[in-house]
Regions:
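Short, structured surface segments that line ligand/substrate-binding pockets
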Residues: 434-474, 550-586
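Helix-loop-helix units of permease transmembrane domains in multi-pass membrane transporters
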Residues: 87-120, 286, 290-291, 530-550
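Internal/C-terminal transmembrane anchor helices
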Residues: 303-311, 345-387
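Terminal transmembrane helical anchor/hairpin motif
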Residues: 3-5, 41-66, 191-281, 286-295, ...
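Membrane-interface segments at or immediately adjacent to transmembrane helices
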Residues: 378-463
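Aromatic- and glycine-rich beta-strand/loop motifs that create alpha-glucan
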Residues: 1-27
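Long, hydrophobic alpha-helical segments
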Residues: 67-96
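Secretory targeting signals
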Residues: 39, 62, 69, 116-179, ...
């Protein structure tokens, strides 16, 4: 009969378990503290048979389990790397790798044996924690199987990905201590490069705005993406009924973000693909490269060029900001070239394991690296992508958020969008004419010079993306920027934002106002508002925004500052539903004459014990 060959070797499996069981013990010990012991602690506080206690017990057990899932990210990140370092450690020594590869075991068998031993150990630890947690919960007559199953599944998916990533790092190097370095770099390199490029563009581009991190950058940062996918899912309020005199109490049920399963499944699929790549590399890996920085010769130029370029860009930028803070583009370029060459030399010395690396070919390659590094910096400086002058077409914009000092609004009507785009173009034209950038100057630096304002725009585009810009511009009287900015700050919704009454619309308008108060800061006098008075004040604020006594001039500080003598704490209390209310703070700018007249007619009284957070509301009627 033909002899059948197994895909793994039982002896290797047993050997790995015997050698690396302390790692599994540590993994389980940490998890025991994180989950089962926390379940016991939370459940003991609910030990009883009173009405409502069982519901609280269920909520607390559920919350402990769901809140432990972010810990799975950290545990999988650490122990995925440790497990990979353990099972592939023999590849880092010429003696052990020669002994292992001399055994009558194929590399495919060895690969699957090591992978199964590592993933099997992590899975065994997870299942043990699952059972211990269930046992601890059962002692209090309730087990949240759904939450426990969710924890087990997500933890397994994370462990698969991080172990695969650690195995890839172990397969490309012959140094054991280089594995965690590569592992950490692969988890954050995309984010670090984005931060470097973002900082450079902020230096060079007029109007650059620190917007949200692009989606593809977050996906290339596994630990951050997975953390965001399983943490901060919010909480659902739950009302629990107890016997009198306790009555109804409010609790929170922690929820898992909707993206948790999809994100972890995607990364687990990537982990399987990485393991397939590791299998291929393992079969091709030369045994004699044990102890070398890179296990494959074709990876060495990639490594030194990556270290040279990334180190030059990042460390050069850091050097410029720390040692030459006032330096310009030339200073930045020199810093990046110097640091790039140093990193390039250091990488080659590590790869060659010697200091004598200089020859004609090496100098030519160094010169090529310097040219590429300089080209990258120059291309960013020249804005070859057209970022600085990119202006969206009006038909491509679904809505726009505009902000100038304290005046802001969000609109989707074509007229508002077109006005903001016109201002956008005018600001760029003024910059092209003057070349003036004021972002890094304080107001004291420009004292006696042109009047400046911060202007921010945020376009939401039809393709689902956004375009954000932020400028500090000088406003010359009669210029296009002055004219267009005047039109925008004099919109009704812009005036409403200056007063603060714009937020009232989301709560139902004036009819939602139930009370309020006005307090003078200088005398600590207070005027409490009845429901009718508070609604009258809200109506007058809306009237001031819609029909101002005169146009606002963005060149004047009066357009956003308090009216003289009306620097007050004004709060309107609005009802959201039958059980919830909130407050809307108001300002009294100079143009709000109706509000000023109304406040002058109020009766103020001194009350040293007055606390705005405990104002009694006598006229709350939930009709």
């Amino acid at each position: 009969m033909p002899r059948k060959t197994s895909f793994c070797n039982a002896a290797l499996l047993r050997s790995d378990i015997k050698r690396y069981w302390p790692l599994l013990f540590l993994y389980v010990a940490v998890w025991v503290v994180i989950l089962p012991m926390q379940i016991l602690s939370a459940s003991r506080e609910c030990d009883g048979v009173a009405e409502g206690i069982m519901t609280v017990l269920q909520l607390r057990q559920h919350n402990v389990i769901i809140q432990s899932i972010p810990a799975s990210v950290v545990m999988s990140l650490l122990f995925g790397c440790f497990a990979a370092m353990a099972v592939w450690s023999y590849l880092m020594s010429g003696r052990t790798v020669g002994l292992m590869h001399a055994l009558p075991v194929t590399r495919t068998q060895a690969f699957f044996s090591h992978v199964l031993s590592a993933l099997g150990a992590l899975t065994a630890g997870n299942v043990l924690i699952f059972l211990l947690t269930a046992l601890c919960s059962a002692g209090f007559s309730y087990v949240d199987w759904a939450a426990l199953g969710t924890w087990l599944l997500l933890t397994e998916l994370m462990a698969l990905f991080f172990f695969a990533l650690g195995s890839l790092c172990a397969m490309v190097t012959g140094w054991l201590l280089a594995v965690p370095v590569l592992y950490g770099a692969m988890n954050v390199i995309a984010l670090l490069l984005y931060a470097v490029i973002s900082t450079m563009t902020q230096m060079f581009y007029f109007g650059y705005s620190n917007s949200d991190i692009p989606e593809f950058i977050t996906w290339l940062t596994p630990v951050g993406r997975i953390w965001d996918a399983v943490a901060n899912g919010g909480a659902q309020p739950i009302e629990v009924q107890f016997r009198e005199p306790i009555g109804t109490q409010s609790y929170q049920r922690v929820q898992l973000p909707a993206s948790a399963f999809s994100t972890c499944i995607i990364y687990a699929a990537v982990g399987i693909a990485l393991l397939a790549l590791v299998w291929w590399l393992y079969k091709k890996r030369p045994s004699e490269t044990a102890g070398d920085a890179m296990s494959f010769r074709w990876l060495r130029p990639i490594a030194r060029w990556s270290i040279g370029l990334c180190g030059g860009l990042g460390l050069g930028l850091f050097l410029r900001y720390t040692a030459f803070i006032d330096g310009g583009f030339a200073c930045l370029l020199i810093c990046q070239l110097v640091m790039g060459v140093i990193c390039f030399f250091a990488a080659q010395m590590l790869l060659q394991k010697k200091f004598r690396i200089f020859n004609k070919r090496w100098w030519l390659e160094t010169a090529a690296m310097v040219l590429v590094l300089a080209a990258v910096t120059v291309c960013v400086k020249l804005d070859i992508t057209g970022y600085q002058h990119r202006v969206p077409d009006a038909e491509d914009v679904t809505s726009v958020h505009f902000s100038a000092s304290y005046a802001d609004f969000t609109a989707d009507d074509p007229a508002a969008v077109e006005s903001v785009i016109s201002l956008h173009r005018a600001i760029l034209e003024q910059y092209d004419e003057t070349g003036e950038r004021l972002e890094n100057q304080t107001y004291l630096d420009t004292e006696g010079g042109p009047i400046t304002r911060y202007v921010r725009v945020d376009y939401q585009l039809r393709n689902g993306t956004s375009l954000r810009r932020e400028w500090r511009v000088s406003i010359v009287n009669g210029s296009d920027v002055h004219r267009l900015l005047t039109q925008l700050v004099n919109r009704t919704d812009s005036r409403e934002s200056l007063i603060g009454i714009d937020s009232l619309a989301r709560y139902g308008g004036v009819n939602a106002v139930i009370s309020g108060y006005v307090r003078r800061y200088d005398t600590d006098e207070v005027a409490e508002l009845t429901r009718q008075q508070a609604q009258d004040l809200a109506s007058l604020a809306l009237a001031d925004a819609a029909n101002s006594s005169g146009p606002l001039d963005p060149r004047s500080d009066d357009f956003y500052s308090y009216a003289k003598g009306y620097d007050m704490d004004i709060q309107l209390r609005v009802v959201i539903d039958r059980e919830t209310s909130t407050t809307v703070p108001l300002n009294v700018p100079a143009f709000a004459l109706r509000m000023q007249k109304f406040i002058d007619g109020l009766e103020f009284q001194v009350d040293g014990t007055y606390d705005s957070s405990t104002v009694a509301v006598d006229e709350i009627l939930y009709n």
